[in-house]
């Protein structure tokens, strides 16, 4: 009895795996392509400081990658808020392994398109409203 059901179950599992695999691959490559386009647009933007480009070329040390408190953030200083926002940028850096992603994610006190794209690529969009409130709190002018 079991000798007939085991091969059938293995066949079903194999078919399900093969059907899901192309979709998983397309999601990750699609996210990587979007991030490349965002970063390329930021690099060519005249408003972007040249220091970020120097970091990408390796001429300076990217201290902002490890910086927990951004002096441009004029709102509430709460370590828990910064820690939550910092984890998104750190995870995004670990996903793409590009120092420019880390610095662009933190720019303008986390209120930027790269931060949102990082949340999307990390599959965290169901928590976006919660993180948007945190960004508003740390970036609010006094």
UniProtKB/Swiss-Prot annotation:
What does the entry give for GO biological process?
circadian rhythm; glucose metabolic process; neuropeptide signaling pathway
Do you know which SUPFAM superfamilies this protein is assigned to? Crustacean CHH/MIH/GIH neurohormone
**Source species, domain of life:** Eukaryota
Q: List the disulfide bonds.
A: 73-109, 89-105, 92-118
On this chain, the residues bearing Pyrrolidone carboxylic acid are 67
Instruction: Return the PROSITE patterns for the record.
Output: CHH_MIH_GIH
**Keyword Nucleotide-binding, does the record have it?**
no
Q: Which residues form the signal peptide?
A: 1-26
**Processing and modification events after translation:** The N-terminus is blocked only in isoform CHH-II but not in isoform CHH-I.
Q: Which residues carry this modification: Valine amide?
A: 138
A Gene Ontology term for the protein's cellular component? extracellular region
Q: According to its UniProt record, in which tissues is this protein expressed?
A: Produced by the medulla terminalis X-organ in the eyestalks and transported to the sinus gland where they are stored and released.
Which InterPro entries does the annotation name? Crust_neurhormone_CS, Crust_neurhormone_H, Crust_neurohorm, Crust_neurohorm_sf, Hyperglycemic, Hyperglycemic1
Against Pfam families, the record matches this protein to:
Crust_neuro_H, Crust_neurohorm
One GO MF annotation is: neuropeptide hormone activity
Q: Which UniProt keywords apply?
A: Amidation, Carbohydrate metabolism, Cleavage on pair of basic residues, Disulfide bond, Glucose metabolism, Hormone, Neuropeptide, Pyrrolidone carboxylic acid, Secreted, Signal
Q: Where in the cell is it found?
A: Secreted
Similarity remark = Belongs to the arthropod CHH/MIH/GIH/VIH hormone family.
What does the UniProt function comment say about this protein? Hormone found in the sinus gland of isopods and decapods which controls the blood sugar level. Has a secretagogue action over the amylase released from the midgut gland. May act as a stress hormone and may be involved in the control of molting and reproduction.
Q: What is this protein called?
A: Crustacean hyperglycemic hormones
Q: Which organism is it from?
A: Carcinus maenas
